[in-house]
Amino acid sequence: MTIIRKKHPLIKIINHSFIDLPAPSNISSWWNFGSLLGLCLIIQILTGLFLAMHYTSDTATAFSSVTHICRDVNYGWLIRYMHANGASMFFICLFLHVGRGIYYGSYNMIETWNMGIVLLFAVMATAFMGYVLPWGQMSFWGATVITNLLSAIPYIGTTLVEWIWGGFSVDKATLTRFFAFHFILPFIITALVLVHLLFLHETGSNNPTGLNSDADKIPFHPYYTIKDFLGVLILLMAFMILTLFFPDILGDPDNYTPANPLNTPPHIKPEWYFLFAYAILRSIPNKLGGVLALILSIVILAFMPLLHTSKQRALTFRPITQTMYWILVADLLVLTWIGGQPVEYPFIIIGQTASIAYFAIIVILMPMAGMFENNIMDLD
């Protein structure tokens, strides 16, 4: 078996990636989320495949086909709710994974980090298009509002929006193409994940100290396979509790009403995992400014290696920047809350303050804290 594992052209790639991979001896549970994201992706592809067997991407029958899946297909209700809540679990793992990367300075592995940002955009695009497919009220109006943002692009905006819609409004052509893209994107994401791993294995994993761990490596299997398996069990338990006991807790009741272009819902909002970005978008009165802020809220992650001023990699031994980090986490929770609130006083001013704080912490306060820590520890 060892000979096959180490000599076979295909199996040896798996061996070098998941079995004999040298890993730091001290990586904590925060390093579990990579494998959990892989599990989420597999769950989403499998449940999505079974849903696609019964779904019809036509405005007249899309809503009915989802109802049919839930009522008439064997365990269709389970597959549908696993897919819907699987997206939420995916984003929870994604946010924790990115948060870990920021905390421990993993963004210094620039190729891996940038590929991660591309993956984040791809997953967000996939989730947005997936939310449109059941063709409920929030599906339709969410698609209308978000795609309409592209009309803020000077000169070509309106043409671009109509090109994406395939007409003069969100209609059958839009739904059909969104289904096609929603189906193909997870496979593109899988390919990008392999590139992400390829870049990671070029440098090796980071660790909680932020120090070079070449002198103290252990094989990935069995140490981290068993550790990842524990993470998998915990995730599956949380996922099953969410899916079987509270399937609709993260959804919007408006999406149980079929799409009606003549009736606008009182509060149009995206799924919970986009609310922080939606709050940043709404905090700027100008349409183009809002769109730029929305894009920048994610793109700013790509500038983190440039904004790193500390002589230390991780925040483990940096209490001042740690404080800034946790204020940033709290700020993102505030933005998520504000994104789900109506556009009225006092929510507008809270959203604007939280948006300014978000960019200020990343661009100004954390780099300044890094320089200050260098000074007080004489690391110049």
UniProtKB/Swiss-Prot annotation:
It is found in: Mitochondrion inner membrane. Heme b b562 binds at H83, H182. It comes from the Eukaryota. The chain crosses the membrane at residues 33-53, 77-98, 113-133, 178-198, 226-246, 288-308, 320-340, 347-367. Heme 1 (or BL or b562) is low-potential and absorbs at about 562 nm, and heme 2 (or BH or b566) is high-potential and absorbs at about 566 nm. GO terms for cellular component: mitochondrial inner membrane; respiratory chain complex III. Binds 2 heme b groups non-covalently. One of its GO terms (molecular function) is metal ion binding. Keywords: Electron transport, Heme, Iron, Membrane, Metal-binding, Mitochondrion, Mitochondrion inner membrane, Respiratory chain, Transmembrane, Transmembrane helix, Transport, Ubiquinone. This is Cytochrome b. Its cofactor is heme b.
